[in-house]
């Protein structure tokens, strides 16, 4: 098979105007692969280290020239001559070169950029689309798009503590139909907000970020938009949350809706929401190191709703193994840049699926036009993808790639729909 001939990197801008790393890998047969690395706003404390320059005179300290140089001067020369299809060997060579537990020497942004670009180059050399190259002949499941249409928390400046309110078109027959439903609800929500005199400004991920009095007010607005768009809440379109609770956890308590709450009180609050709204999924309902609290909420609500670990697991197989062992959460959020390599991402997904955990592929709030995660979602048949509102090119690029994949798969394409959420029983 073709071997790695050249590795180059550059500093580009992400969707928030911050620098990030883009890598191109060239093989000796002329095949090339390119990948750009995303970056998060609410980052888990246990994520792999993203290398930033810290020079206040360039990009306010957020430059990534160090990571770019790490690719050009250290990683590239090390990988020349490697068989591009040996993904695990290549990733391991980079881990060995970095020689830290958290990729803090070369930077997870440098390592991931190379890791993904190698996969793209190898798929081109194999004359296969990336989803087929990584997933083999069984990759055929199109994910439910979990569209973040209302923003609060650290993605917006408002009184809403919950970071993301998502819609999940579970009743659609195909991915393309699901995307249409989502876009129609999104536009209807804009009209609803305008009618009520609320702001239609957008958050980082394309969702609206009005200043609302409560989290329930946000859910009520979305239910209203679903109905006005002509769909049935819970039957055709369900709801999902990303609470990002670590963002409002202070001194052992959750500062939520103007009150200081314990994990038990937060769990009671979620129980009320689950009984009142057609929720299929709650992500990061508690602090990222509150393992005992996570077990309690999973025991109480895990048979009714998907409890997703994002900051809890940070796509790390070791932390995920602990969650499986202790019964904390029942689903994994998959973010390639949290762990910093394709191999470890695939290992985490495999571990989750082997143990009955669902997986949701995810973007970051700082994205680019890179569409790798769309292919990855289909490659691992995870059945769910979270990549923002059906607006802004950095988000829509992923949805459009999934439309193309659905077209390539043709009759073999299967839309996950309701089957992605087996714990969700019925509409409210």
UniProtKB/Swiss-Prot annotation:
EC number from the UniProt entry: 4.2.1.11
Source organism, top-level taxon: Bacteria
RNA-binding as UniProt keyword: no
Biochemical pathway: Carbohydrate degradation; glycolysis; pyruvate from D-glyceraldehyde 3-phosphate: step 4/5
Cofactor(s) required for function per UniProt: Mg(2+)
Coiled-coil ranges (or none): none
Localization per record: Cytoplasm; Secreted; Cell surface
Keywords noted in UniProt: Cytoplasm, Glycolysis, Lyase, Magnesium, Metal-binding, Secreted
Assigned GO CC terms: cell surface; extracellular region; phosphopyruvate hydratase complex
Major localization listed first in the record, in broad terms: cytoplasm
Pfam annotation, one family: Enolase_C
Reaction equations catalysed: (2R)-2-phosphoglycerate = phosphoenolpyruvate + H2O
InterPro entries (UniProt xref): Enolase, Enolase-like_C_sf, Enolase-like_N, Enolase_C, Enolase_CS, Enolase_N
UniProt: Mg(2+) binding residues: 242, 283, 310
Function: Catalyzes the reversible conversion of 2-phosphoglycerate (2-PG) into phosphoenolpyruvate (PEP). It is essential for the degradation of carbohydrates via glycolysis.
PANTHER family in the record: ENOLASE (PTHR11902:SF1)
Protein family (similarity comment): Belongs to the enolase family.
HAMAP family named in the record: Enolase (MF_00318)
Protein name per the record: Enolase
Organism: Streptomyces avermitilis (strain ATCC 31267 / DSM 46492 / JCM 5070 / NBRC 14893 / NCIMB 12804 / NRRL 8165 / MA-4680)
């Amino acid at each position: 098979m073709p071997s790695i001939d050249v590795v180059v990197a550059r500093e580009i801008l992400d969707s928030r105007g911050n620098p990030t790393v883009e890598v191109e890998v060239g093989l000796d047969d002329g095949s090339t692969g390119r990948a750009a690395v995303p970056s998060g706003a609410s980052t888990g404390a246990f994520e792999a280290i993203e290398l930033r320059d810290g020079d206040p005179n360039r990009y306010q300290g957020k430059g990534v020239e160090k990571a770019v140089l790490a690719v050009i001067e250290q990683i590239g020369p090390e990988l020349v001559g490697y068989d591009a299809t040996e993904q695990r060997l290549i990733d391991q060579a980079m881990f060995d070169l970095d020689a830290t537990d958290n990729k803090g020497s070369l930077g997870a942004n440098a390592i991931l950029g190379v890791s993904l670009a190698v996969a793209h180059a190898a798929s081109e050399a194999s004359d296969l689309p990336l989803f087929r190259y990584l997933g083999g002949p069984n990759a055929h499941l199109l994910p439910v798009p979990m569209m973040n249409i209302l923003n609060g928390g650290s993605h917006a400046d408002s009184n809403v503590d919950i970071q993301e309110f998502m819609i999940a078109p579970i009743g659609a027959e195909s991915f393309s139909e699901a995307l249409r439903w989502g876009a129609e609800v999104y536009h209807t929500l804009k009209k609803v907000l305008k009618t009520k005199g609320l702001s239609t400004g957008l958050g980082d991920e394309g969702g609206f970020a009005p200043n609302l009095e409560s989290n329930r007010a946000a859910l009520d607005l979305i239910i209203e938009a679903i109905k006005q768009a002509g769909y049935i809440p819970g039957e055709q379109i369900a709801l999902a949350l990303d609470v990002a609770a670590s963002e409002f956890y202070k001194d052992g308590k959750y500062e939520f809706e103007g009150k200081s709450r314990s994990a038990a009180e937060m769990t009671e609050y979620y129980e009320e929401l689950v009984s009142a709204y057609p929720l299929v999924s709650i992500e990061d309902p508690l602090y990222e190191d509150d393992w005992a609290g996570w077990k309690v909420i999973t025991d109480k609500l895990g048979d009714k709703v998907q409890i997703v670990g994002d900051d809890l697991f940070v796509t790390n197989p070791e932390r995920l193994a602990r969650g499986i062992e202790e019964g904390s959460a029942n689903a994994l959020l998959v973010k390639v840049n949290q762990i910093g390599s394709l191999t470890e991402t695939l290992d985490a997904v495999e571990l989750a699926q082997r143990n009955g955990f669902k997986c949701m592929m995810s973007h970051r709030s700082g994205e680019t036009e890179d569409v790798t995660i769309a292919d990855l979602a289909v490659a691992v048949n995870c059945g769910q993808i979270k990549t923002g509102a059906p607006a802004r090119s950095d988000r829509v690029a992923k949805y459009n790639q999934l439309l193309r994949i659905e077209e390539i798969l043709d009759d073999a394409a299967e839309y996950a729909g309701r089957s992605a959420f087996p714990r969700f029983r019925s509409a409210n």
